[in-house]
């Protein structure tokens, strides 16, 4: 693909990678010596299983997080928290008519509960007002519904079609939108006494850390990642007909490789039989046996 088509592949062109970057950038100034214990958020957020214990890493496999996995190295979350967040994002994608940017930012908002700094703070997740404004601006035309039981708004679900309206009809700005969704909002993003999720200071510190990690990558890893991004973008931009054609090409190529492998295996088996025949030439029967094998090979 001409050295992977191009080197200029931006993360924003790949929604999955862009989302992971957004989560990393908004993860707050997570420090290795983070102290404190997990405090359940109350409201619509399920209690932490680590209530009263410090945040810890989450293993992969059956105990892995169903969402927000960027925080698995240090978090108060378990699947108890990420399952509802996963459902909310899925509903927004399925019924909310949300843009890609809205989906990414709303998932980032839902994942705030898994940020270790947020986990040790009392009360609902404290979100920076500037970040709430970004989420609302991206999601104001997406459809949300009011949950009468939990007294919050959330993405429309399968049973919410009657009272499903645009976010801009529920609230008029980012602060009221976040509060209506069950979050606390902090107006001063740069407060050191009370850090909030998505502050400018935390973004800059994590960007610097992320840049250091990126420079440590080997050229081979960087090249491989670039190739993967280019291939992913190329496939996304293909039409349905082109994707079907590409799939058929892969199928035909696979069948050709299987046939080649079978032919090679058959030749290897015949060669082994011939070697055995040559070892038997010491007796009379061996010569006739070898001749028979040679005739079989010639006929094939």
Curated annotation (Swiss-Prot):
Keyword Disulfide bond in the entry? The reply is: yes
Spell out the protein name for this chain.
Folate-binding protein 1
Question: What keywords were assigned to this record?
Answer: Disulfide bond, Folate-binding, Glycoprotein, Membrane, Receptor, Signal, Transmembrane, Transmembrane helix
Topology relative to the membrane: Single-pass type I membrane protein
A Pfam family annotated for this chain is: Folate_rec
Record's keyword annotation contains Isomerase: no
Membrane spanning residue stretches: 238-258
> Signal peptide: which range, if any?
1-28
Domain of life assignment: Eukaryota
* Glycosylation sites (chain numbering): 173
- Tell me what induces its expression: Induced by salicylic acid (SA), correlating with the accumulation of folates.
